[in-house]
């Protein structure tokens, strides 16, 4: 099994938690806590040309964003609309992209999550670096392909995340 043969659609998480861009960081933080997740995709409702109401992914809030806000010790930020502090523009990938495409995008953009959006704009899932690591670690062929691939040289942070996940996985299996 090669990195190019595994499609994003086969490993993405299909249940994605979203909130509208008028929510506060406090509301988003509560959503993250209640759902035990590290990010929330931010959507904006709009009316398409055919007068059908649709949602468009316009940003993302991650646990890092929340820590940055809380760490500022400025309680007024908790009540700002999330659209003022979310990461944007959104970097996404399509469901037909390969695992290799997802890895390269994450590494080049220095991100850990990619919303999976169909070409016509419909959100269908999310893929994380953790999802990618899990596939690589749990399949010898994929691990071998990954190690021997000519991927863009791994950045320090990407390599750290991979080795951290790998060591956590090994520790978990030995308990």
Q: Residue ranges of each PLM-predicted region?
A:
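Residue-level marker of regulatory loop/turn positions in helix-turn-helix DNA-binding domains and
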Residues: 21, 50, 74
């Amino acid at each position: 099994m090669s990195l190019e043969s595994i499609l994003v659609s086969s490993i993405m998480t299909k249940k994605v938690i979203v909130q509208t861009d008028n929510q506060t960081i406090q509301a988003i933080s509560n959503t993250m806590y209640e759902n035990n997740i590290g990010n929330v995709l931010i959507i904006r409702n709009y009316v398409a040309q055919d007068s059908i109401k649709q949602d468009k992914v316009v940003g993302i809030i991650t646990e890092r964003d929340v820590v940055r806000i809380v760490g500022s010790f400025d309680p007024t930020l908790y009540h700002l609309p999330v659209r003022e502090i979310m990461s944007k523009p959104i970097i996404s990938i399509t469901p037909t992209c390969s695992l290799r495409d997802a890895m390269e995008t994450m590494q080049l953009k220095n991100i850990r999550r990619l919303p999976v959006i169909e070409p016509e704009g419909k959100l269908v899932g999310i893929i994380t670096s953790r999802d990618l690591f899990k596939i690589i670690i749990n399949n010898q062929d994929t691990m071998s392909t990954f190690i021997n691939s000519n991927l863009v040289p791994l950045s320090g942070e990407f390599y750290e995340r991979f080795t951290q996940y790998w060591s956590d996985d090994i520790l978990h299996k030995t308990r």
